Amino acid sequence: MAPVCVLVGPPGSGKTTVGQALAELLGVEFRDTDLDVEATAGKPISEIFIDEGEAHFRALEREAVAAQLASATGVLALGGGAVLAEQTRAALVGHTVVYLSVELPDAVRRVGLGAGRPLLAVNPRATLKHLLDQRRPYYAAVATATVVTDGRTPEQLAVEVAALLAA
């Protein structure tokens, strides 16, 4: 089994929102590895960062990604930093991976400058810019397709991704 597609991208790119709309459009299940991590840990990601640290969160994230790549059959959204792990990038080979690209102004507007996002807690705009700059090459490297999300609704994006999948 394999997911219909895997969505990757930075915070604010719309992975969860677009993923839910896409899954509904395709009539398949939607999974978000961030939610899987929270279920495994029994607490929100922000608390995992505070209590156990980012390294522990990333280990849980790698496990969640590996499990979902092996079992998910619908649309799978990965956490924004999942592609930083070489193990995850290697596991994505052979999957249909859609990179939801977003520029800083739209990302800032969508994430609300750090609400519930531990990596954006201090100087969120500068941190988000750094994350975008740091991670873009990783998203591009794993992607089989890229969709620009700026100024578009989740429904418009879901239709575009569905068309890419059908092509």
UniProtKB/Swiss-Prot annotation:
Substrate binds at D34, R58, G80, R135. Pathway: Metabolic intermediate biosynthesis; chorismate biosynthesis; chorismate from D-erythrose 4-phosphate and phosphoenolpyruvate: step 5/7. Binds 1 Mg(2+) ion per subunit. CDD domains: SK. ATP binds at G12, S13, G14, K15, T16, T17, R117, R152. GO terms for biological process: amino acid biosynthetic process; aromatic amino acid family biosynthetic process; chorismate biosynthetic process. Pfam families: SKI. Belongs to the shikimate kinase family. Catalyzes the specific phosphorylation of the 3-hydroxyl group of shikimic acid using ATP as a cosubstrate. Monomer. This is Shikimate kinase. The lineage of its organism: Bacteria, Bacillati, Actinomycetota, Actinomycetes, Micromonosporales.
